[in-house]
């Protein structure tokens, strides 16, 4: 699902093709791992070639990665069915070639320096500009698109959604390891990805015109050539009429993914409806947003997060309990009550970063066992 493909008009305006309904779509990145060694396999091109033309299966920056995307869906349940139907034949092709599908924010022991770049001008240009940091982007994530009706709502919703940034990152955190070492972080991916010059947290804009001026400035100064080079953790997708949430580490299974998609869908639709009701959405000071991102990346579900401009704090899982209760009416309207109810399973059973560390401990630090465990979680 290509994002931000629409470009600016000569007058600097960016058309946002509003969504009539609050639809949802998902992009899910997978790594290919060798069935025996559990190291990464740079065979995505041959896998995609064997699958043939399929608008639901895409190549990515590195040759060890395939991305599976949905169409336009009504809710999280429909999106999961869409993904599963695409993944079944993809996994069959992958297994026939002696590999497995793997998803986490990072691979626990792979060497980033030996990974191969997908042959495409935009990827070559990215590496040419970003050099060492760009070559280290051995990371995988999930992107969730939610339809929004009008451009004037987009920036207030994105800015307000930053209140829930740490909740979403902590729940999905799945990248404790890097190059064979435990980083001490729940999400090392979040710290890695923000090193790219146009990645990281979005600016606190309130008006669509501010975003248009920002894009114009970025192009005028040569920072970007196209809007898809804006790699914010939450960004507008004008040609799709969506807000794209890119906070999540890679997710290994449909159960957790359905919960995260439902939560994201409900959060954005709730903010959209509050705007319709004439409410001014809350704004978190950017220094608190930045700190919350770091706390969630470092401590995951044990993070004490900052709640508001008054600097009140709370354990993220306690705040999630209240948030889920508040979103119940929205979930009923979107027919995703069941999927939203799975969110507490993540912090009751352990998030991916916690499960990975448990497996490593049980196997005397053998990180191949971590890959085994993550691969086995993908039940279709």
UniProtKB/Swiss-Prot annotation:
Q: Which domain of life is it from?
A: Bacteria
**Keyword flag tRNA-binding:** no
Which GO biological process entries does UniProt record here? modified amino acid biosynthetic process
Enzyme Commission number(s) of this protein: 6.3.2.2
Any one GO MF annotation of this record? glutamate-cysteine ligase activity
Q: Name one Pfam family in it.
A: GCS2
* Keywords attached to this entry: ATP-binding, Ligase, Nucleotide-binding
Q: Which reaction does it catalyse?
A: L-cysteine + L-glutamate + ATP = gamma-L-glutamyl-L-cysteine + ADP + phosphate + H(+)
Its function, per the record, reads: ATP-dependent carboxylate-amine ligase which exhibits weak glutamate--cysteine ligase activity.
The similarity annotation says: Belongs to the glutamate--cysteine ligase type 2 family. YbdK subfamily.
Extract the NCBIfam families matched here. gshA_cyan_rel, PRK13517.1-2, PRK13517.1-3, PRK13517.1-4
Q: What is this protein called?
A: Putative glutamate--cysteine ligase 2-1
């Amino acid at each position: 699902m290509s994002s931000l493909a629409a470009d600016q008009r000569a007058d600097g305006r960016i058309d946002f093709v509003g969504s009539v309904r609050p639809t949802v779509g998902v992009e899910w990145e997978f790594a290919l791992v060798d069935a025996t060694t559990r190291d990464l396999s740079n065979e995505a091109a041959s896998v995609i070639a064997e699958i043939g033309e399929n608008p639901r299966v895409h190549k990515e920056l590195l040759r060890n990665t395939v991305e599976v995307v949905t169409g336009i869906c009504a809710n999280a349940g429909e999106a999961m069915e869409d993904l599963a139907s695409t993944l079944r034949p993809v996994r069959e092709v992958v297994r026939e070639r002696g590999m497995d599908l793997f998803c986490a924010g990072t691979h626990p022991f792979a060497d980033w320096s030996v990974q191969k770049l997908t042959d495409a001008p935009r990827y070559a240009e990215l590496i040419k500009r970003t050099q060492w940091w760009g070559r280290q982007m051995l990371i995988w994530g999930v992107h969730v698109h939610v339809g929004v009706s009008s451009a004037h709502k987009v920036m207030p919703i994105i800015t307000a959604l930053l209140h829930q940034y740490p909740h979403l990152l902590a729940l999905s955190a799945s990248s404790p390891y890097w190059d064979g070492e435990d980083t001490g972080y729940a999400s090392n991916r979040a710290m890695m990805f923000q090193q790219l010059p146009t990645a990281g947290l979005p600016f606190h804009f309130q008006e669509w015109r501010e975003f248009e001026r920002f894009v114009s400035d970025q192009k005028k100064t040569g920072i970007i050539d196209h809007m898809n080079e804006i790699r914010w953790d939450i960004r507008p997708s004008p040609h799709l009429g969506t807000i794209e949430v890119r906070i999540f580490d890679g997710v290994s299974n449909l159960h957790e993914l359905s919960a995260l998609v439902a939560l994201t869908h409900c959060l954005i639709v709730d903010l959209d409806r509050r705007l319709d009701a004439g409410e001014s959405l809350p704004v978190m000071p950017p220094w608190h947003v930045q700190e919350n991102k770091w706390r969630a990346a470092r401590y995951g579900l044990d993070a004490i997060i900052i709640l508001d401009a008054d600097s009140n704090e709370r354990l993220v899982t306690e705040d999630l309990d209240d948030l889920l209760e508040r979103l119940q009416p929205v979930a009923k309207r979107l027919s995703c009550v069941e999927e939203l109810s799975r969110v507490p399973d993540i912090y009751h059973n352990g998030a991916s970063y916690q499960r990975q560390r448990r497996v490593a401990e049980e196997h005397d630090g053998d990180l191949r066992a971590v890959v085994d465990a993550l691969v086995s979680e993908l039940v279709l």
